[in-house]
């Protein structure tokens, strides 16, 4: 699996370099779920596909920007699912964005998730790698990823990052969010899931939520290459996740590679409070 991680690092570095002079315009194409693709979405996907295709340990790849699974080496063990550029719609305002990766063994499902990674393209290039404990790495002047620290969630946080169009929220969710603000929580929502999860993780706690809404009853975030890898990282850091019903997002099973789900990530206090609010 270390070979797979090494190739992911190469792809992340190439994307980071390309971001220095990006084309932020939209293409004429849409991805499988109907999102209009930025030209840099397509370029990032091409970079990752090209790089991971050179790794003999990868059986197949699944991308947010591809309609179907792409088989690379049937004799290999690992399947890599990824969002090549999460938050790409924020490129024109120069917000921090990132890439998300899940490494599955033999079959793509949460039970077979062996490692998860995400990169942050911000003021500096950082990479979080998680097999057992999430570890933060930072690119140095020699183009090497240097270990910075292990990441761990506190029992309770102060950050409230809540997505979904508010007018379409269910009453129970609106009430839950209001109660958090009444407790003194701070709104921190950028529109890039990876950036918001990263802030909660590095600050040690809080909650990220993207609930079921009237216009998206199954949520909008994709299980295999967004929800599962970030849930894996949060839970390995001591946090909790749920879809509002299950005790963990990693209990969920889906047949379609572009399946979506409501999702909540956070410290133990916030997720326990949410489950109570959702099941009263």
Swiss-Prot record:
It comes from the Bacteria. Its EC number is 3.1.3.11. Mg(2+) 1 binds at residues 64, 83, 85. Keywords: Carbohydrate metabolism, Cytoplasm, Hydrolase, Magnesium, Metal-binding. InterPro entries: FBPase_C_dom, FBPase_class-1, FBPase_N, FBPtase, SBPase. Its cofactor is Mg(2+). Mg(2+) 2 binds at residues 83, 86, 226. Binds 2 magnesium ions per subunit. It is found in: Cytoplasm. The keyword RNA-binding does not apply. Substrate binds at residues 86-89, 189, 220. One of its GO terms (molecular function) is magnesium ion binding. Pathway: Carbohydrate biosynthesis; gluconeogenesis. GO terms for cellular component: cytosol. GO terms for biological process: fructose 1,6-bisphosphate metabolic process; fructose 6-phosphate metabolic process; fructose metabolic process; gluconeogenesis; sucrose biosynthetic process. It catalyses: beta-D-fructose 1,6-bisphosphate + H2O = beta-D-fructose 6-phosphate + phosphate. Pfam families: FBPase (PF00316), FBPase_C (PF18913). The keyword Metal-binding applies. It is an enzyme of class 3 (hydrolase). Belongs to the FBPase class 1 family. NCBIfam families: PRK09293.2-3 (NF006782). Homotetramer. This is Fructose-1,6-bisphosphatase class 1. It comes from Campylobacter jejuni (strain RM1221). The lineage of its organism: Bacteria, Pseudomonadati, Campylobacterota, Epsilonproteobacteria, Campylobacterales. The gene is fbp.
